Amino acid sequence: MNHKKDLYVLGIETSCDETAAAIVKNGTDIISNVVASQIESHKRFGGVVPEIASRHHVEQITIVLEEAFAQADMTFDDIDAIAVTEGPGLVGALLIGVNAAKALSFARGIPLVGVHHIAGHIYANRLVQDIQFPAIALVVSGGHTELVYMKEHGSFEVIGETLDDAAGEAYDKVARTMGLPYPGGPHIDKLAQKGEANVPLPRAWLEEGSYHFSFSGLKSAVINTLHNASQKGETIAPEDLSASFQESVIDVLVTKTERAAEAYGVKQVLLAGGVAANKGLRAALEKTFSSRPEIELLIPPLSLCTDNAAMIAAAGTVAFEKGIRGKYDMNGQPGLDLTSY
């Protein structure tokens, strides 16, 4: 009888402002997962400063790697492959992780696999439950808002994407206008839970049948609403404005996801990306798909929504099993395309 050997993959993630390392077994089981966040260092600047991010990655990369192995009680002799975020992201930040992965791969003779950051977010779902195909992933983060159709493992077709601001980017810009701290998304989400969506704001549906998104008009509408109220000496409750803004964003995201899921006849809808931690979005998706028993909704736990290396190891496992290998001329690719990955 054939017994398949367990596959242990070391994941490394440094695409933005988290330095992370993890070890995952067979693409589904987290053995260790270590994340060093830099949020406090970037808060006073109101956003991620690339130079600061890169410096922190240099300081933290060895520490998180050592901790990942310590938590797993494993050594490099136990590792079958090293998966690293190749892109997209901040080029200086990416280079820290990529160079660390290449050095370890070369020194230890362990195969190297480059991973697309968004593929990682999608495969965070596989760390919770196996993915059934065909599936559609709603990817919502600070830099990306996409609907991705998957007919099998490692197959990605972007059927809808933002034409301007990503949803997470719109959240941060609106939060800054409202005087809320960075990162703005969680603050708006928290305020929205206490408010009423009574401020009229637009929803960008675009042309009929389109799965694309646009949030720049909504962002401008919020800014204009605040400016007009100020000119008249009026105040708008931040809870109500947050609830109204969030409802406009979520309405479009959920409606287009449901339409796409129906049109493509999928078995599962996967939520992915940092904004997947948003309580309002999670609740709206759960409510919508609770009445669609033929479509299963997968939502990762909060710890796997934001950037982490376990998701990179999970996606890297799929690539490794398909025979994909990275070369030592691998570089950080800030504009890496998901469909060509």
From Swiss-Prot:
Obligatory cofactor(s): Fe(2+)
A GO cellular component entry from the record: cytoplasm
Catalytic activity, reaction form: L-threonylcarbamoyladenylate + adenosine(37) in tRNA = N(6)-L-threonylcarbamoyladenosine(37) in tRNA + AMP + H(+)
Binding site for substrate: V139, V140, S141, G142, G143, D172, G185, D189, N278
GO MF entries: iron ion binding; N(6)-L-threonylcarbamoyladenine synthase activity
Residues annotated for Fe cation binding in this entry: H117, H121, D307
UniProt KW Transferase keyword: yes
Coiled coil region boundaries: none
Compartments it resides in: Cytoplasm
Function of the protein: Required for the formation of a threonylcarbamoyl group on adenosine at position 37 (t(6)A37) in tRNAs that read codons beginning with adenine. Is involved in the transfer of the threonylcarbamoyl moiety of threonylcarbamoyl-AMP (TC-AMP) to the N6 group of A37, together with TsaE and TsaB. TsaD likely plays a direct catalytic role in this reaction.
Family: Belongs to the KAE1 / TsaD family.
Protein name: tRNA N6-adenosine threonylcarbamoyltransferase
Biological source species: Bacillus licheniformis (strain ATCC 14580 / DSM 13 / JCM 2505 / CCUG 7422 / NBRC 12200 / NCIMB 9375 / NCTC 10341 / NRRL NRS-1264 / Gibson 46)
Encoding gene per record: tsaD
